[in-house]
Amino acid sequence: MGQKTLQGLVAAAALAASVANAQQPGTFTPEVHPTLPTWKCTTSGGCVQQDTSVVLDWNYRWFHTEDGSKSCITSSGVDRTLCPDEATCAKNCFVEGVNYTSSGVETSGSSLTLRQFFKGSDGAINSVSPRVYLLGGDGNYVVLKLLGQELSFDVDVSSLPCGENAALYLSEMDATGGRNEYNTGGAEYGSGYCDAQCPVQNWNNGTLNTGRVGSCCNEMDILEANSKAEAFTPHPCIGNSCDKSGCGFNAYARGYHNYWAPGGTLDTSRPFTMITRFVTDDGTTSGKLARIERVYVQDGKKVPSAAPGGDVITADGCTSAQPYGGLSGMGDALGRGMVLALSIWNDASGYMNWLDAGSNGPCSDTEGNPSNILANHPDAHVVLSNIRWGDIGSTVDTGDGDNNGGGPNPSSTTTATATTTSSGPAEPTQTHYGQCGGKGWTGPTRCETPYTCKYQNDWYSQCL
């Protein structure tokens, strides 16, 4: 992950101008955020382009004394001589701007490329593993309120081998990044990170973390993937108690071994569109989260889901999360609003086995060793583009091939022969809260008893 920055831990009387004066000519890098346009959509008004960019995480940056002669960070954390307390640290230390290209971050139009490695001018290849956040034109993080809404984007994971993790997720971070009198940079310098793993960082919500507490908050993993395996997972929290494991959906782990794969049902050797819907019990943006639904589009057509009835996470299938607020707690966080984080990383300790090895994917236990990745895949990167969010059915035209009725069973091919265990009607039915209609929809239009198909908008009807 990266490592430089510019403004930041400056006392209230030493705002932006003082930071500029503190820089020695030619030794500091200005903070220039790469532009990344996104779109907010409604069924009535279409999609409106947003003034957005990305910002590299605060923890990846260079913190230094005024003349740049000494780092304020040591191998064991913050230098306690320079930073015995927040006010003193703000007087002594500055946070530097970054070169985004050498940090593994590139944008072009609406596309964001995140690279695991960067080759320097000396020929050395370094692991940079960047993490960035979506930043608004006002200098604060964009807060996405996605309860009863959907988020879509295009993604290309074709260059990502076993052991890599391209992640796009939501974190309930403070919109300002914890901006305060001692941290005037805030979100503009990527501060305030938190997630359900409760990482212990040098700063907690923009404030010097003298107590070494974990930075805990609700986390919704929309995408954690390489070309071999993928999972989407809610991680709700109650206070500082979080569901760290989560109750995710991984097609391979559920037995659908040729779904997410190069040449698979969803061909990960080519780009595709991913849509995640946060469906409520009453179809509104103020209801209770009942279902997290995943939809894929490739070549202009909707890809059949891995599981019959759809690739979904429901409260009934997420009982392990109940002590942490459950799916409804995740919905509450989505309703309050969350910040979009995007990253690429690998795992030197566990080789990302939890994602793509054993019962979770086709990779061997050692294939994900970062040294193997560097030797064989130095160009490992992910491309994320065309990020849109808004009303369900408003962000992507799924085309005439729209079909949420589900694909074949894990290790079998579809046949016309009825199974001996079938007890339902011949006509396929949709489950509670599932989609049952909309433009281009060719999946089930009949709901299971006692539910009925209720119109929500031209693109989406729901079993309620």
From Swiss-Prot:
Start and end residues of each stretch annotated as Disordered: 394-439
Biased composition (Low complexity): 409-426
SMART domains: fCBD
Catalytic EC class: hydrolase
Glycosylation sites: N99, N205
Role: Endoglucanase that is involved in the biological conversion of cellulose to glucose. Hydrolyzes internal beta-1,4-glucosidic bonds. Shows relatively high activity toward barley beta-glucan and carboxymethyl cellulose (CMC), and lower activity toward lichenan, wheat arabinoxylan and other xylans.
Identification of the protein by name: Endoglucanase 7a
Source organism: Thermothelomyces thermophilus (strain ATCC 42464 / BCRC 31852 / DSM 1799) (Sporotrichum thermophile)
Lineage per the UniProt record: Eukaryota, Fungi, Dikarya, Ascomycota, Pezizomycotina
